Amino acid sequence: MKTYVSEFPMEVSIPNYEKVNFGCAVAELRLRPKAEVDDEWMALSSILGDKDIDVCTFKGREDTRLVQVLNDMGFKFISTFYTLSLDRTDFMETTHENIALRVEEATDADIERVYDIERGVFDYSTYQMDDRLSADKMSERNVRRVASYVGKPNNHIFLIKRDSAILGFIQFLYDDDIAHAVNGAIVRSLQDQFVGSLMYSGAFKSIFNTGITTITSGVSAQNIRALRIHQACGFKIIDAEIHLRWIRK
């Protein structure tokens, strides 16, 4: 973790600071919800002054004054992201007549195929990046992010399969009685063919059968397909935040 402290009595943490290996550094920034705009401006100025950082992502509550400050500093809006939550008692299972599809937890032998799926479906256009952050480069960054959880005891990856073919995956981190969905993807050719709905529903059912009581997930407001899948299973939107990104010129 890399931490910056401004002149004001507030601390800014970057939990996912990563110097990626394609000539660019990425800092994902999250500020305290009740921080004053002037505090945030000072903290951001300190971060953007770090010559090791070429890209900075701001995540936080939407605030007109703060957004104007960020725009003046060169940040551009990416998307609104929703936090969704599902309690076990509200879960609605999705069913389909295609019994050839099944959901099961991944083994070590499946991980390379999971990486291949992540590479194949990455859509960099939602990130509004320049040439330094191409689709291939950002795809590899996402693969490394998926891989960083593998091997940890609270990491669980569920797959949807047809026979031996892996068609998609969804990854969770368990925290006591809560499971957090951190990533998921379906092979591009099978999107809009009910595969995603069955995978998510099957994974949620398996998780709740372990004693987990709540599942949380984050979805971009632009990803209408994913929102519909979550809401069909009973998820409710409980929070929203905006993501803006700055790129060093």
Task: Map each language-model feature to its residues.
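A short beta-loop-alpha structural element at the N-terminal edge
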Residues: 102-118, 122-125
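Acyl-donor-binding surface of acyltransferase catalytic domains
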Residues: 32-101, 105-109, 241-246
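A short helix-loop-beta-strand connector motif used in the catalytic cores of GNAT acetyltransferases and
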Residues: 52-53, 147-158, 180
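Conserved beta-hairpin
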Residues: 154-170
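Conserved acetyl-CoA-binding loop-helix of GNAT-fold acetyltransferases
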Residues: 36-46, 183-186, 192-207, 228-232
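Conserved acetyl-CoA binding element of GNAT-fold acetyltransferases
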Residues: 20-35, 82, 177-188
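Conserved beta-strand-loop-alpha-helix junction that forms the acyl-donor binding cleft
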Residues: 57-66, 187, 217-227, 245-248
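Conserved active-site alpha-helix within GNAT-family acetyltransferase domains
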Residues: 63-77, 197, 221-239
